[in-house]
């Protein structure tokens, strides 16, 4: 397979300094809304979460953005999972949105802070009951003998909680990533991409154009 021969050109647009919001969260919101309105992405909220464990080994996976504001960017997971363990050992993480049909990427670096029980309960019980039961049934990242074993356990729990509220597992909850740095990337012709980095300077954000 000759991957080196594969070529594509970027030409959907450009990104100029005067087009940027002074506030990176507002810039993120602008691009997120455009991504949603484009109907070109199956899920614009899907983002790569990169973590590093105590042995300095990196790992990454796709999670879903469930909310954001000037405090940070929120997602939910099983805290006993690989990513949860990584975050407990090293809260410095990176988020990455790859909106390839729009020739855009957003990178965010920050610290992941656990959400409180009230927030976790509120979101957990807003989910479909089937999803709540699935969270209860799965010991995420642990070995399982077969799919049948997992399905059988799930169906048993689904029956148990058919007419009662599903308790949120203590291992299930969310994190808020407090951003320290953003980068907005727009594909450009001849690989001369437009890149802008937002870096926190005390209470303000400093915007720097980066070479592609």
Swiss-Prot record:
Protein residues bound to substrate: 7-10, 66, 123, 127, 131, 191-193
GO biological process, one term: pyridoxine biosynthetic process
Domain of life (superkingdom): Bacteria
Pfam families with a match to the protein in the record: PNP_phzG_C, PNPOx_N
Enzyme Commission designation: 1.4.3.5
Cofactor: FMN
Entry's family note: Belongs to the pyridoxamine 5'-phosphate oxidase family.
Subunit structure: Homodimer.
Annotated protein name in UniProt: Pyridoxine/pyridoxamine 5'-phosphate oxidase
Organism of this sequence: Idiomarina loihiensis (strain ATCC BAA-735 / DSM 15497 / L2-TR)
